[in-house]
């Protein structure tokens, strides 16, 4: 809330600076700016709009402090941050190891798209990290974690994964959209890259799309080069809206946590449902969540114990306060039957 205040413009909110061209007074000035950018690539020195403006720079400063990272790159979508992370590290002939229950577009990217570029993906069981270590080879360049896993809500032993990666000198990335750095700070924990879909809790109002990729110092240059090549940069209008949303992130997530706990308590008492959420204290999921997170967000899974698919539709269609649609983390309550979610 108190990061990157704009005393120059004397406005409590940063102005939206839209620019394709950055104007300079002289050739010396543009060369001077380019020299500053080379010496300090995180300092907000731009010579062209594709690199960003002061509006996107302010958001990056706020997120860098929130993540406690070396730097944060912002992308047009959350999945753009996933792509940038993987594209920055992998090359033809490499291998990556990915958590099995990942977000379906991430699986599509790693399982099918990367295969066309001779990049092999091996999926590991989050409940059996021996399968992770067993599949490491000399070609393994990245371990990609999603915590908790989409659909299954498996919480993994992050410390153990980092230990395996460190022992084998492999880079690590985690999709931390569920927890956000408000509840978990992956870079501080030891991850090289931390991904958050800013479309969700960062924005909080279901009116903008964006992504963030926080990085450690040792992978910064690789990601920096990849970002400049791909042009994966968030626009100033979206950056402004996400910055505005971040002002209330703590208040909103605290309320999400309280409401989710009430819903989880209610659902856990019904034998017709299997709750996928870190609620039962005697479960492995709860222990892994408690070990690394300071809180829980509002997204949960629910299995209806019935072989009749119509019972699922009947349940979802009978909800009065929940809309039916994709995404989450906004102001509205949503429900979705995951069977129909193939691509994002």
Say what each PLM segment does.
Residues 26-80, 111-112:
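Conserved N-terminal alpha-helix of the aminotransferase class I/II PLP-enzyme fold
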Residues 10, 186-187, 291-292:
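Short glycine-biased active-site loop of nucleotidyltransferases that positions the nucleotide triphosphate
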Residues 1-17:
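Short conserved active-site loop signatures built around small residues
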Residues 111-112, 120-122, 134, 138, ...:
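PLP-dependent enzyme catalytic core of the Aspartate aminotransferase-like
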Residues 24, 128-133, 283-284:
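A short acidic, often aromatic-flanked loop/helix-cap motif at beta-alpha or helix-coil junctions
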Residues 4, 71-270:
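Conserved PLP-enzyme active-site core in the AAT-like
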Residues 17-23, 28:
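C-terminal substrate-binding/catalytic lobe of Rossmann-fold NAD(P)-dependent oxidoreductases
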Residues 26, 30, 37-44, 51-52, ...:
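Active-site C-terminal subdomain of aminotransferase-like
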């Amino acid at each position: 809330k108190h990061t990157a205040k704009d005393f120059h413009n004397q406005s409590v909110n940063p102005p939206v600076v839209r620019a394709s061209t950055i104007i300079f007074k002289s050739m010396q000035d543009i060369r001077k700016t380019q020299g500053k950018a080379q010496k300090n690539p995180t300092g907000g020195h731009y010579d062209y709009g594709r690199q960003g403006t002061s509006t996107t720079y302010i958001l990056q400063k706020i997120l860098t402090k929130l993540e406690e990272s070396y730097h944060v790159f912002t992308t047009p979508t959350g999945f753009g941050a996933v792509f940038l992370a993987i594209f920055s590290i992998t090359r033809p002939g490499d291998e990556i190891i990915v958590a099995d229950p990942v977000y379906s577009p991430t699986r599509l990217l790693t399982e099918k798209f990367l295969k066309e570029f001779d990049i092999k993906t091996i999926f590991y069981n989050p409940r059996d990290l021996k399968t992770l270590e067993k599949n490491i080879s000399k070609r393994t360049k990245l371990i990609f974690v999603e915590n908790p896993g989409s659909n299954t809500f498996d919480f993994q032993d992050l410390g153990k994964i980092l230990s395996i990666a460190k022992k084998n000198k492999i880079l690590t990335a985690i999709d931390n959209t569920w927890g956000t750095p408000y509840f978990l700070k992956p870079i501080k924990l030891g991850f090289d890259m931390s991904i958050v879909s800013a479309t969700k809790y960062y924005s909080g109002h279901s009116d903008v799309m964006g992504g963030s990729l926080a990085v450690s110092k040792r992978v910064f240059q690789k990601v920096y080069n990849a970002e400049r090549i791909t042009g994966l940069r968030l626009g100033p209008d979206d950056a402004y809206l996400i910055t505005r949303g971040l002002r209330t992130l703590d208040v909103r997530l605290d309320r999400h946590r309280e409401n989710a706990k009430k819903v989880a308590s209610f659902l856990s008492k019904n034998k017709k449902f299997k709750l996928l959420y870190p609620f039962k204290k005697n479960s492995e999921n709860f222990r892994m969540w408690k070990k690394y997170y300071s809180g829980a967000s509002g997204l949960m899974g629910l299995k209806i114990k019935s072989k009749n698919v119509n019972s699922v539709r009947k349940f979802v269609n009978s909800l009065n306060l929940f809309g039916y649609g994709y995404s989450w983390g906004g102001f509205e309550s949503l429900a979705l039957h995951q069977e129909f979610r193939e691509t994002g």
